[in-house]
Amino acid sequence: MHSILRFEDKLDFEITDVYDTKYSLRVGKNTNKEVKSDSSGHIIKNIEKIDWDSFDTLILGHIDMLILQMKSYDFKNNLISEALRHNKQIYSFDDLGQIVKNNKRVQSPTILPEHLPPFRYEKLHENIVPVVGVFGTGGRQGKFTLQVTLRNCLRNKGFKVGQIGTEPSALLFGMEYVFPIGYNSVYSLRIHDYDVIRYLNETIHKLEDTRCDIILVGSQSASVNIYPNHLYYYNIFQTNFLMGTRPDAIILSISMNDTYEYIEKTISFLESTVECEVIALCLFPVVQTFDWAGPVDPSNITVSYTHLRA
């Protein structure tokens, strides 16, 4: 949801209000401080006092943890029912299929088995248009922000960009496809294994049919497993996404605490899994404001770069 506010000026629609619950302790705050961006400037309002006449579409983010804090398990159902009663459209980051069925006014990024292309005896399309991927060594590295920034830069230079995003907000930015492998993907992504590769390969082919000049794709979290004794850290979705999109070039997002060995391991994995080359590293955040001893003075931090393949 932060990316929508951070890049509000890049959206094709107007955000009229931003709502949250009082339990989040954000009501009354300015969004530009919450998302650290000057492009947004809304005062966050209490959703219990929502003005239904001020908008036509409700964008509903991931609110499961918020529901647990509120201990109001009917909150989502009641909010959706009230929105539909006021004839509002709903775009939800989470799948609402268990709450609302067959309502065209309710949309969420969900990939189902019926979305798979026809079976072609294991045959896949060959990529023709250049594909650039954004992958990472971990979470919270600004990978989606980087994708939106790249998209805007390329479009400003006259390139026609095709794009597959893995954040639910991808479609709101005008990206042609969303493949939700981030938070709550167990509910949004109902295909697995070879079917993921089939679906993504067909999606790349459909983007090529639009006569785009370049295709951007972006993954989630880390690319290789560093904790083999915990199932949660096995990057199955990311590996399938890599093989399904087969990028020609990759920009690798890294963190300040990544070791050179771990970065090299990630690069080797990416380049050996598909025929590609890691062409750049993107460091985020550049300044770490806290360490184990407390606050750090940014003026005393020096960021050095050593070429990994020297």
What are these regions (language model features)?
Residues M1-Q98, N300:
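Long, basic/Gly/Ser/Thr-rich N-terminal segments
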Residues K76-V131:
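Extreme N-terminal, non-catalytic leader segments
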Residues T137, S253-M256, L281-G294:
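G-domain G4 guanine-recognition motif of GTPases
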Residues Y262-T273:
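Conserved C-terminal guanine-recognition region of P-loop GTPase G domains, centered on the G4
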Residues T306-A310:
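Conserved small/polar residues in nucleotide/adenosyl-binding loops
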